[in-house]
Every structure is written in C-alpha cells, then in structure tokens.
Amino acid sequence: LLKLRDAIGELIGVNFDPSHMMWMGGNPLTAIRQLEGAIYHVHAKDTRIDREHSDPNGLLETKVNERFRERAWNYVTLGYGHGDIWWRDFIALLAQTGYNGVLSIEHEDLSMSPLEGVRKSVDFLNQIMVREIPNQP
C-alpha cells in the first residue's frame, strides 16, 4: 500500500481492521505507526486466541467459524479478546497518528447474538473513549 501511495498519492488509504493482524500473530499497534496518515477507516473488531488449540496446531485455522469451540482463534466482541488497556492504547495511537474518523463495530462473535454483541461493544467503547481533548498550546 505504501508503495502504491508513493506512486499515486493520497487517493488510496487503508481500511484498518486489527482483528486480522491479531489472529495472524502481527501487532496492530506497530502497523498503525507504519501506516501513519494512510488509515482512512477503522474496524473495531477483536480476536481471541485459544492457546489450548493454537499452541499444538498454530494459528492457521481451517475449521469453519461455527465450530468456534474447537478453533485456535475466533472473532469476538470488543474486550473479549483484548482488554481495555489494549484498546485504550489502540485508540490513543490512532489519534496520535492523525486518525480522527469513526470506529465501525464489526460483529462476528458466534458466542452471542449480534444485538447483544453490538450493545456490549458500544458499552465497552463508551467506557474507554476519550471525549474531551484539552487545547494544546
């Protein structure tokens, strides 16, 4: 993406979804730093790694999502994979690197209904979001 941006400019940017990097073993926070200024949209989506299944088999998962109890990783409701400290760091880093857009909740947690998952995600974000930023000199 960055090479493409070098070639054509800021016409193109990233729809950043941290959950994919999580299950691949990457670090979304490092990626945010590398993509500074190129993040145009952000998904608020979490992933839980189940070490009982991932340690002996790795993270490359071939079981269908509906077999979530047997999988090495699953998409989960916000806060059910990574806690509030991680998500605070994520949101703060997005702001520090110039992102001031929305966080779009993407619910794919099969352990609860979509309505409950979205409600829990909204409640979670409401608890950790910074609402008032002081004026900077």
Q: Which stretches of residues belong to each language-model region?
A:
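Residues at the N-termini of beta-strands
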Residues: 41, 101-102
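A short, acidic, flexible beta-alpha connecting loop/helix-capping segment that sits on the rim
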Residues: 104-114
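A structural motif corresponding to the C-terminal end of an alpha-helix
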Residues: 8, 89-100, 131-132
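Substrate-binding clefts and catalytic carboxylate motifs of secreted carbohydrate-active enzymes
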Residues: 92, 97, 113, 117, ...
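C-terminal helical cap(s) of enzyme catalytic domains, especially alpha/beta-barrels
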Residues: 114-134
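A general structural detector for well-ordered alpha-helical segments in enzyme core domains, enriched
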Residues: 1-4, 31, 86-93, 120-125
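Acidic/histidine-rich catalytic cores of soluble enzymes
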Residues: 1-80, 136
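Short, flexible loop/turn segments with low-complexity composition
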Residues: 106-107, 134-137
